[in-house]
Amino acid sequence: QDFTIINNKINSLFSFFKKRYRFFYFDRPETDFFTRDDYFANNENDFPLKEKDKLSYIDNIHFFNKNYLYHKLKIKKNINIDKDTLVVHVRTGDIFNNDWHSLYSQNPLSYYLKISEKYEKVLIISGKNLNNPVLKLLQRYEKFSFQSSSFIDDFNVLLNAKNLASSGVSGFPIVAALMSQKLENFYHSDLYLKEHLNPEMLDGSQVTIHSYKIVDGIQPGKFKKTDENLTKLIDDDITKIIRI
């Protein structure tokens, strides 16, 4: 066997020992299971990967997703997307509720304008709640089209894109990029969290990775609903988007 599925019936008998958080922590110090405050609590966060396992996960995650998980994926569809089309995932929804989710920083308008310069068509994939202020501004540009469909349909567009871009802190486009059999170019900014799925996990020998620094971008932890941050988010100055 190339890998083992650990969620078998025997393990389920001891489910109270399972880790409850949905992310692997790739960038946090290792902790000791036996220092838990309450071994049986469901609200305890998961523990980080052990240091000895972390590099192995990161080095192999692209290969594993592309060559194994993709073939296990039951919802996949084959869609033909033009080579001159850039597909961009723009995150909306819960992170913009109330005072915004401080950790989930998103890219400004200028980022989308910069990465789309060489493309004739840009397809924006977003959630149905169009509460990201950038979306309304992008509608002014003729080359941009928009899709907010079902989870399965939207994911399959990302999965079939030859050119794909993320919008900041979000695992959705990273999963698609890791599994993709067609991806040639991936675009991202320096706004992401290393503790879970992120652009650094993509294998540069498989995909051309285009990385950008956002000058004066809203860093994770500071993404809060303020007039200053809103001004930064809708900024269209592409000179602040620097290839790195």
Label each region the model flagged:
Residues 102, 162-166, 210-213:
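Short, charged/polar micro-motifs that form catalytic or ligand-binding hotspots
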